[in-house]
């Protein structure tokens, strides 16, 4: 790959949260029918230390088709206990009216400003919650959504668009642009087949196109999108079945 991507690190700490996305295929949700189950606090035995980082959110993927993606929280603050406390399935407890919990296949999670964004892949939606209270703020419908990136007050969400199905004629993928104030989709750009992770570098959005549904004819490109025009400028040929795309520290 001839193109080199240089990036200045973003040192801003959104509300002093540290965020971890843990994709645990075997995790189960804690709701049976419409019954709301309280979160399950567990004392880790480790002493909590006051600092900038007050906690970690963990998104559990669950098995495809089970509709049991869950959200956990590791409380590092020491506000409610001398020890670090791990809370399982807090989204169900904080949002008792959401009878289906988070949905089917938690795929990505990030904090932007005061909001927690969660990509629920096979439920074709992005759930947005308050980062402090974990109470639901909005639901954004995105078909077969995959990953998130943020820049300048907008969320950029990659989407396979096509239904989950291994077929050569699967639709080409897209990136959706969402206003983080109104929580509305404001634009969309077509990219390669089955786009996955994406990264913002110097006004450009780089998108890894996997072509995962088109085995053995995988995609092998990175789409480069100009964020001012929100148009695809070009594709960079890299390698088959790409997945991750990260900005380096330069």
Task: Locate the predicted segments by residue.
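Bacterial N-terminal signal peptides that target proteins for export
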Residues: 2-17
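C-terminal motif of bacterial Sec signal peptides marking the signal peptidase cleavage site
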Residues: 25-29
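N-terminal hydrophobic targeting signals that begin at the initiator methionine
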Residues: 1-2, 31
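Predominantly soluble domains enriched in secretory-pathway, periplasmic, or organellar proteins
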Residues: 31-250
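Hydrophobic helical h-region of N-terminal Sec-dependent signal peptides
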Residues: 19-23
